[in-house]
Amino acid sequence: MAVPLGALWAWSVLDKAVISYYSRKYKPVPLPERPNYSHKDVSIIVPTIDTEDTFTECMRLWLKANPREIVIATVERNKARVEQLIEPLRQQHADKIMVVTAALANKRHQLIVGVKSARGKIFALVDDDVYWHVDSVVPYLLAPFEDAEVGAVAGIQSAEVPPERQDVRVITPWEATATFDLCQWKGSREVHFAADGGCWCLSARTLFIRASILQDQSFANAYTQEVIGRRLVNTADDVVLTGLVFDRGWKVSIQNTPEAEVTTNIPRDHRLVWQVLRWDRGNFRTFLGYMLVSPGYRKMMQRHPYTTWKMVERLARPIWAFAYVWAWLQTLYTAPWIAYAYIAWMAFGWKGWLPTYREFLKRYPYCGRQMWAPLLMDYIGPIVDIYVYLTINNDDWLTRRADTKDIED
């Protein structure tokens, strides 16, 4: 009964070989000698509610990039909070900062309200807890737009870990898990893009998009009028936006290079669980919609075959996990040395646990004590997926106080 485990083992090796090949194949777009776009063409749009104290520092870094303007889209109950946080920057940058309010605390609706006030050729959609520490973010995210077929671009996202928390005695398991997850995610995106030009999600932490796309009323309607039952959807804003960009015939680009790296605040406690649940519910709903409704599995495979297959794999993770566990237990009973060899290979072999975690700890050595947490998260992931399927229609934001609204008759 070692045959099933052997087959799954061989499939795993093949999968890693394919990933390795496309990872080497990936190349970011270099800076053009004579760019058609500059910082003066960029309008930053920031939807925000329950705005954190770090917003002032994030704003300072965005303003340092010298964009055309920053449009902050909030709601009336949060406007005073935003005004308080940007006050230290008002005197020097009054002509570049605009605060607008939406009627609904819904990220998609707030974004479109911001779009209506922005004047740039390129919109930078930015989360309110994102830092642009490097001065090259804007030029490197603008570079792919030299190709007239590219509609949207995203770069690398990493964890923002303040100096006082870069300590093995201070950092929490939640922070270590979030940091590791971001590292793994950016690697998978470049592989998907190199394979077939596809991408699950251009993260809205920092996403550059042509203004004309979001200013199209049909696009805005499709983006803001998605419903679950009768309730307007709030979550999965960037996943849905990415799909709509593809649906309208645009290409995207991934700039996985240090020059395009931004960092983001990460949860220090159990709020990471709520964040993961929100992301996974939104992703699963969207992926299932792609496969079963529009554009449909066949068209998805024609458009982005590798990315679509990886999407199917992600949706089927509980089934894959059960298959591996069943095959390993059967092999343990009939040929234990093969079962133990498989575990050893998983731990120490090519791209196994130990090499992967060692590479991560080179950059984040202070996470060393907490590496049990990312490992645990990886292996309870299939169980979490089952819970996500059972609660897939739950669209609560969970970590912030978003509004809910039912569509009218």
Swiss-Prot record:
Pfam families, A to Z: Glyco_tranf_2_3 (PF13641)
Residues with attached carbohydrate: 36
Single GO term (MF): glycosyltransferase activity
Swiss-Prot/TrEMBL keywords: Glycoprotein, Glycosyltransferase, Membrane, Transferase, Transmembrane, Transmembrane helix
Entry's localization field: Membrane
Topology term for the membrane: Single-pass membrane protein
InterPro entries: Glycosyltrans_GT2/GT47, Nucleotide-diphossugar_trans
Chain ranges passing through the membrane: 319-339
Biological pathway: Secondary metabolite biosynthesis
Gene Ontology CC, one term: membrane
EC numbers, comma separated: 2.4.1.-
UniProt function note: NDP-glycosyltransferase; part of the gene cluster that mediates the biosynthesis of luteodienoside A, a glycosylated polyketide consisting of an unusual 1-O-beta-D-glucopyranosyl-myo-inositol (glucinol) ester of 3-hydroxy-2,2,4-trimethylocta-4,6-dienoic acid. LtbB likely serves as a glucinol synthase by transferring D-glucose to myo-inositol using NDP-glucose as a substrate. The ltbA carnitine O-acyltransferase (cAT) domain uses glucinol produced by the glycosyltransferase ltbB as an offloading substrate to release luteodienoside A from the HR-PKS.
Family: Belongs to the GT2 glycosyltransferase family.
Matches recorded under PANTHER family: EXOSTOSIN-LIKE 2, SYNTHASE CPS1, PUTATIVE (AFU_ORTHOLOGUE AFUA_7G02500)-RELATED
Protein name according to UniProt: NDP-glycosyltransferase ltbB
